[in-house]
């Protein structure tokens, strides 16, 4: 392209011509924020700023909890203390959503919701547009896009004999905001429901919201199924296990793979349980029946030199060290890792192995 042509384009449209190397460098400099140990591994690191995330699943499957847990991480100083906006479309936000998420600062979340009269899809998405444009590095959780309703539908009587207009509105919203989100380094999380596939072909359930939303999303996660998480002894349900399918990831990751998330009631995503499961899978913690051995400590006894010294165990005595870090049941193992503040060390050991 000639210099004259470049000058003409720049004069007419502004500085829209950018060197490819600069674009590549800008993408590399985008921060990646962790979600949970299991999802981070499957996604290739977590969620990258400047991207769109779609979380799809059945009701009560853990989508909102996961989104709010991510918000809690984004509130931390090391991740920029980002502004959090929760778009409460479903109007079902409850105290348990706030109290049941470890580390979540409710006083630092701005909730957008209807007062007396319901808000239309156009109004909600218009508010999101203004918030993203005026708040760099923000995180917006739209919960859910499946519950949005067009102004036209709000103004008319309830009917079921025509196609609703929300997919078109969402399509226009995505087009309008596609270049704004990366420029503002924002993260938009679109919580989405599964709906019945009435086409009669293919999957029984499909994601609500239209095709354009899926085209726009940089990362798409589906909760394929869930199961009850119960205590082994008492049989009391303490949470649920989420089986995530990685449809696509902005960071590459394992597309088509599965990530198993552990949601503990009253806590949110149980990151320690996920670390334990990963460590067990990759033999940093071995198991034999109900017994668990911290092999990563057997191989690196200097990490627990203090406790070993207190128990008169020599750093070279591998047999005694193995007995010292062997526990009957997960609970005793967790207590040991808690008491000796070893979770970060375990996480770093996993990161080194998987990098």
Question: Predicted segment positions?
Answer:
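C-terminal regions of RecA-like/P-loop NTPase motor modules
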Residues: 1-22, 228-355
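The Walker A/P-loop phosphate-binding site
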Residues: 2-108, 126, 133
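Charged, alpha-helix-enriched surfaces in structured cytosolic catalytic cores
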Residues: 4, 34, 38, 50, ...
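Conserved, well-folded catalytic cores of nucleic-acid-processing
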Residues: 12, 16, 42-46, 58, ...
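Short hinge/gating elements
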Residues: 52-57, 157-164, 200-203, 257-265, ...
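Conserved inter-motif catalytic segment of the P-loop NTP-binding fold
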Residues: 69, 74, 78-163, 167-172, ...
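N-terminal cationic and glycine-rich segments that engage phosphates or anionic surfaces
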Residues: 153, 196-200, 288-291, 321
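Phosphate-binding/switch region of NTP-binding enzymes
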Residues: 163-282
């Amino acid at each position: 392209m000639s210099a004259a042509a470049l000058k003409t384009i720049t004069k007419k449209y502004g500085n829209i011509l950018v060197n490819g190397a600069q674009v590549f460098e800008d993408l590399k400099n985008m921060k990646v924020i962790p979600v949970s140990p299991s999802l981070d591994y499957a996604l290739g690191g977590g969620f990258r700023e400047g991207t769109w995330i779609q979380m799809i699943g059945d009701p009560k499957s853990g989508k909102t909890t996961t989104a709010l847990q991510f918000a809690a991480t984004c509130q931390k100083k090391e991740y920029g203390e980002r502004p959090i906006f929760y778009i409460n479309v479903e109007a079902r936000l409850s105290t348990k959503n706030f109290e049941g998420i470890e580390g979540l600062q409710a006083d630092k979340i701005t909730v957008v919701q209807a007062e007396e009269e319901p808000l239309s899809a156009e109004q909600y998405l218009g508010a999101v547009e203004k918030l993203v444009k005026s708040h760099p590095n923000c995180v917006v959780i739209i919960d859910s896009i499946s519950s949005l309703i067009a102004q036209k539908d709000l103004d008319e009587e309830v009917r079921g004999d025509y196609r609703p207009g929300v997919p078109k509105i969402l399509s226009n919203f995505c087009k309008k905001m596609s270049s704004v989100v990366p420029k503002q380094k924002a993260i938009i999380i679109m919580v989405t429901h599964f709906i019945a596939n009435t086409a009669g072909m293919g999957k029984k359930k499909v994601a609500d919201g239209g095709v354009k939303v899926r085209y726009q999303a940089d990362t798409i996660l589906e909760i394929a199924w869930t199961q009850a998480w119960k205590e082994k002894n008492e049989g009391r349900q303490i949470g649920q296990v989420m089986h995530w399918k990685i449809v696509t990831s902005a960071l590459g990751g394992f597309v088509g793979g599965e990530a198993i998330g552990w949601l503990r009631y009253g806590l949110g995503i149980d990151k320690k349980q996920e670390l334990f499961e990963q460590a067990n899978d990759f033999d940093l913690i071995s198991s034999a029946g109900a017994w668990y051995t911290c092999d990563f400590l057997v191989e690196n006894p200097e990490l627990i030199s203090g406790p070993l010294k207190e128990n008169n165990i020599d750093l070279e005595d591998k047999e005694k060290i193995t007995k010292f870090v062997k526990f009957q049941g997960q609970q005793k193992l967790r207590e040991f890792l808690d008491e000796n503040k070893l979770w970060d060390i375990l996480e770093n050991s996993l990161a080194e192995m998987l990098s």
